[in-house]
Amino acid sequence: MATNIAINGMGRIGRMVLRIALNNKNLNVKAINASYPPETIAHLLNYDTTHGVYDKKVEPIESGIKVNGHEIKLLSDRNPENLPWNEMDIDVVIEATGKFNHGDKAVAHINAGAKKVLLTGPSKGGDVQMIVKGVNDNQLDIDTYDIFSNASCTTNCIGPVAKVLNDKFGIINGLMTTVHAITNDQKNIDNPHKDLRRARSCNESIIPTSTGAAKALKEVLPEVEGKLHGMALRVPTKNVSLVDLVVDLEQNVTVTQVNDAFKNADLSGVLDVEEAPLVSVDFNTNPHSAIIDSQSTMVMGQNKVKVIAWYDNEWGYSNRVVEVADKIGQLIDDKAMVKAI
């Protein structure tokens, strides 16, 4: 039985999630909630500067949009409690506005009749379970939680990388830097922002700023709590980022041993290893959470290791959102079947 999905928000992540979800036969996208007319949404789905022309035909219709004959209802209400999730039998709402990334706010979707909610960003509080595929998705608990967080794109990258290193060699401590493409949170031209560096034009500078990725990692990989810290460098590219991770390990290692650990990790679809000398644009629209740049792996003093991992911060992350939503839906179905017996 297909999982009924609704997407709240049609920004960068919302549109990428919709494109990907429509290729998943386990999911039935029934509705989107956005403040734009169907003509605008259809156009932005059909033509994307970063990820290219969509391979499906999206048309605006009176009730919303039609994608290759599949009709999706368009709603426009800024208050999630007013949305007809109960009437539409919505199993999972993918919350992609960024405005309800707190359990106490996201619960509005539950009050409207949705069974579960998946946040497309780290939770800012409340009763929310954070999930990173390849790290703790086997602990997804629909009996205890109604609201889930897919963490951030950077946590989805560093999570599997840190897990492999910690499981195989043990992490003593480390520092990470994400070299991150520009995002909607930055300014095209100098304008006020609570982070004075992010107030500066994103197209003109490398901008040092904060990231919560290393701190959030303890939520999904508690074994490394207190062992990792990090920062971000925002760079003037439109997409694709990387994590530069330097750790001290409990064991002495070689470059080959480190790269082999990633190659042999049971993380198909989540973590990949690239041996060619590629650059960021080559990873655009790559679906993995992390792609190890094997040529950049370094070892100093036998146990200090530097690893570079690429990630498409839009497409890779959105793939994980869809996969986690799919898993939540499957668990809902399994629970319903047990009750029916």
UniProtKB/Swiss-Prot annotation:
Compartments annotated for it: namely: Cytoplasm
Where do the annotations place D-glyceraldehyde 3-phosphate binding? 152-154, 183, 198, 211-212, 234
Where in the sequence is the active site? Answer: 153
Where the protein is mainly located, per its record? cytoplasm
Keywords from the named record: Cytoplasm, Glycolysis, NAD, Nucleotide-binding, Oxidoreductase
Q: Which GO terms describe its cellular component?
A: cytoplasm
Family stated for the protein in its record: Belongs to the glyceraldehyde-3-phosphate dehydrogenase family.
The protein's name in its UniProt record: Glyceraldehyde-3-phosphate dehydrogenase 2
Source organism (scientific name): Staphylococcus epidermidis (strain ATCC 35984 / DSM 28319 / BCRC 17069 / CCUG 31568 / BM 3577 / RP62A)
- The record's gene field reads gapA2
